[in-house]
Amino acid sequence: MNSAPPEAAVPLPPRGAAPAARRSRFRGACLLASLALFAGSARADAVDTLREFVRDVKSGRADFTQTVTSADGQRKRSSGGSFEFERPNRFRFAYTKPFEQLIVSDGQKVWIHDLGLNQVSVRRLNQALGATPAALLAGASIDKEFELAAQPSKDGVDWVLATPRQKDGAFQSMRVGFRGRELAAVEILDNFGQRSVLQFSRYAANATLPPQNFQFVPPQGADVVEQ
């Protein structure tokens, strides 16, 4: 591939970013959405824990911080916020820093709202998921989509390496780490060598979530773009 790599593996576009940057941000959100399904208790076999959680957990919520490092290690970008998910296919991400952005899937469409610019982009969920990790939200088999391998524990965190079987996706691999019964961290390595580290706190599995959290109506005066 001859194109230049994007600035961030899970990018946070500046105000007024181009549509391509928003699409990259959406792909990052899809990755994060699918990772919500991976939070479970750490046992001797973290791979089995992952499979059990995909099967048994129907909803969840957490806070997150995210740091993206460029392939050369010179540039870093940070963001943070909260997320919620509810199977099948519904999720919500509320970014609070460095600026406010809301990403909502109602099970049919995905809405991305830049609050500062009052801009909304929308696309159908089935067009957005494809073979990405977010397909797990649609009930895909984790073993069908990924090769899983337990990795050595480090500093009290148990790790699972998930490598997509399809090689034309948005990332090379991801590592999911558990501490005790809670998701501790996720590392995503994209196809340009950029690495995203996601750290989770206040995770709650099978949480009762208000239905309206997964609904979105564009605010009055918003510029809405169908993709």
Features from the language model and the residues they span:
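An acidic-aromatic
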Residues: 82-131, 196-197
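Gly/Pro-enriched, hydrophobic low-complexity segments
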Residues: 121, 141-227
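Bacterial N-terminal signal peptides that target proteins for export
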Residues: 3-30
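Amphipathic hydrophobic-ligand
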Residues: 75-81, 194
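Bacterial N-terminal signal peptides
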Residues: 29-39
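N-terminal leader/targeting segments and the immediate start of mature chains
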Residues: 2, 36, 42-76, 218-227
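A generic structural motif
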Residues: 65-71, 94-96, 113-115, 163-165, ...
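Short, solvent-exposed helix-to-loop capping segments enriched in aromatics
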Residues: 54, 129-143
